[in-house]
Amino acid sequence: VVSERLAALGIEHQTGVGKTGIVAVVRGQTTNSGRSVGLRADMDALPMQEDNTFAHRSRYDGRMHGCGHDGHTTMLLAAARYLALTRAFDGTVTLIFQPGEEGYAGGKAMIEDGLFERFPADQVYALHNWPGLPVGKIAVRPGPMMAAADRITIDIEGKGGHGAHPHQAVDPVLVAGHIITAAQSIVARNVSPIDTAVVSLCAMHAGHPGAMSV
């Protein structure tokens, strides 16, 4: 879709950068300065089912834009259209449509594929939608704005048994509950209150819904 939109606007672009990334180039009315600025948006969706009934809901089962990357892509396409129609600047604007932002190292793949050797940029700008901000407002700050994240997976092995005889089992659900609660003290008691950190355990899989008493 992105490639089709860029082609319709007559914007030169390269597909397959970092496997599924797209890079477009818009040149200003003049390029005497030799300056080049990159604008980047992420494109990937999340592997989850969208249960909304909006007209703009995902058309693909098991995949949805739960983090607003469709909005980011739309904004970058709008910027591409405006820049291509006006070209009221000196230099070059590189439009970077990045895949695999949600934990799949799409940005790294593009860089390793020679992104900045093929499309040099003096600076690169990006943004993230923030529903809590009023329409028409943007928020900036010096220093880091968005945090990097690590993923953890904890496997708990218990001992099966019947819910009526908990003393004969080792209940992994109870253990998981204690871990989830205790994890919240990691930040509260190990990170300075003037620093920023978040620990979130966002999913738990335990037991079987078809066997409620086991």
Label the predicted regions.
Residues I22-V23, L46-M48, N52-M64, D70-G71, ...:
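Histidine/acidic-residue-rich, glycine-tolerant segments that coordinate divalent metal ions
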Residues V1-H65, T74-L77, R81-F89:
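Acidic/His- and Gly-rich active-site-bordering loop/insert found
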